[in-house]
C-alpha cells in the first residue's frame, strides 16, 4: 500500500489530544496550547502544562513540516533524498514530575516521507519511549518494560529485545559513561515489510506510552519527600540537559535546520542544578541509582 501521510497526521493529532487529556486527568491542571507556523512550510501545536499538582512541567508537541528540498545536513548521510520534496511529522513529549519519586518520561513517534515525480517515495517511521528515574523501584521498571514487551509481541518475538537494546545504546551519556535512565524502546528507519505494518507498530508505541507510565505516576505521586530528595532530583536532571544538548540527534537536527527553538527545547526541565564532583553518600538511596540504571534484562 502507498504510504498515506494524511492518515498518519490524523492519528498523531488524536494522539496529542489523548495524551494531554490523560496527563491533565492525573494532574488536574490544563495544558496551554501554542499553535505556530513554519516559514518554510508547515507548523505545529505545542502544549505545555506548568506548575501542576503532579507535573512541574509536561510538554506534548505536534509538528508537521514540509518543504521542496531537504536541508543539506539531512542529505549528507542520505544522498538518495537530494532533490526530493519532504514531509516530516511527529508527536514528542517529556514529563518532568514534581515528586522526585516519580520518574521523568519521554516518548516520541514520527513519520518521514520524501518524494519526487517518477520515483517511489522514500519513507520511514521512528519513535519509542524511555524512563528516567531518580529513585529506583524494581516493580516500576518491570511494569515499564513489560508494557513495552507486550505491545511489541504482536509484531514478532524479536522486536522488543532489538528495540530495547537500541534504546539502551542510544540513551547513553558517553562523557559520563552512564545510561540516561532504564530505557524502553527506540526504533528508526522502519519501513518493512510494508506501510500498514509499520504504521500499526508506531500506533502501538504511541498508545502504549500512557499504559506504561501513568500507573507508575499514580503509585509514586503521593510519596512524602524532603529537601534532600528534591536536591538530588535537580542534580540528576542535569544529566537530562547534558544528553539533550550534547547527544540527542533530534534536538541537534532541529536546532541546525532552523526548527522552532521553543518547541525543541520544551524537553528541558524547568529547574536543574549542577554540583562540582558530587558524590552521593555511600549506601544511600541516591548512591543506589547508578547501579539501578545499569543495562539489564528487566523481565
UniProtKB/Swiss-Prot annotation:
Residues 240-275 are annotated as: Important for dimerization. Gene3D superfamilies: Coproporphyrinogen III oxidase, aerobic. The record marks 175 as: Important for dimerization. Its EC number is 1.3.3.3. The active site is at residue 106. Substrate binds at residues 92, 108-110, 258-260. InterPro entries: Coprogen_oxidase_aer, Coprogen_oxidase_aer_sf, Coprogen_oxidase_CS. It catalyses: coproporphyrinogen III + O2 + 2 H(+) = protoporphyrinogen IX + 2 CO2 + 2 H2O. One of its GO terms (cellular component) is cytoplasm. Signal peptide: none annotated. HAMAP family: Coprogen_oxidas (MF_00333). NCBIfam families: PRK05330.1. Involved in the heme biosynthesis. Catalyzes the aerobic oxidative decarboxylation of propionate groups of rings A and B of coproporphyrinogen-III to yield the vinyl groups in protoporphyrinogen-IX. Homodimer. This is Oxygen-dependent coproporphyrinogen-III oxidase.
